[in-house]
């Protein structure tokens, strides 16, 4: 039996705006409008404005999505540049190959896609974009832990599978960095495939205070003679800052490093980290093949023989839960990070 269904049939607001009813919270039955008050601006909102501004200056910029214009923040781009907006439907593989084709003809395509859906197009990323070194930018939304959307929407794989290709990968930790690095990635400074990833929701207030220096990495905390450094990227940095404060209260001095360029590493970053005896690297990413694994190898190749603590996702099946709950379950909350450092310090003292 072949049954043809129609999304939203029988309910006017859903038929008129099917993308809004893909997943819903409480809403008014008569109007279809959400009952919840409008939330603060998100990374997606800021990306939406930034890509429109950049497209005004560069006529070669085109935006591609796979049936997610609303979720990826491209509705504004679609209205402003209809001739440069392409929704290919639920066909992520085609989105990537289409982008490669446009790039081969001198355009600058930006593939706007959720991290979890980017997985569907990995073959095309390798063969059609990466091997040919096509000038394609990947804007990866919903990166890292994703609340509410469930187990299948966790953005925990893209750092691992993109770093295998040597693709430049950036992860802003606030809106200023998002705007700056998106501008850089769409400039002549880069050529070939590259990616920027950002989480669902808004920026962390504490991370926003650090602004954007334009550097590949920064120290958020620096103390004299520290032998321990905590390293991470994106939202996980907020937990590192909390862990650093708690460790300071326990008389354990730590520096905190923020990575913006996740891969490939710069020689200077590896050299700076080689000065420490204990390095804790935390990330909302699957452990195998992750940025942390690459970094540990790079340090060892540089002759470093200190203690490397890698806090990452060890179980690929994450629960449907809030970000705080997922971090607690995976050992990526501040309490677990503090415990990991304390254990490493104690072990080191026992070896003396």
Where would I find each of the regions flagged by the language model?
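Acidic/polar residues at beta-strand termini and the immediately following turn/coil
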Residues: 28-30
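Thiamine diphosphate
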Residues: 2-23, 32-79, 87, 93-97, ...
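Conserved glycine-bearing catalytic or ligand-binding loops at nucleotide- and phosphate-handling centers
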Residues: 171-189
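Acidic (Asp/Glu)-rich catalytic clusters
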Residues: 106, 128-130
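Glycine-rich phosphate/pyrophosphate-binding loops
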Residues: 107-117, 136
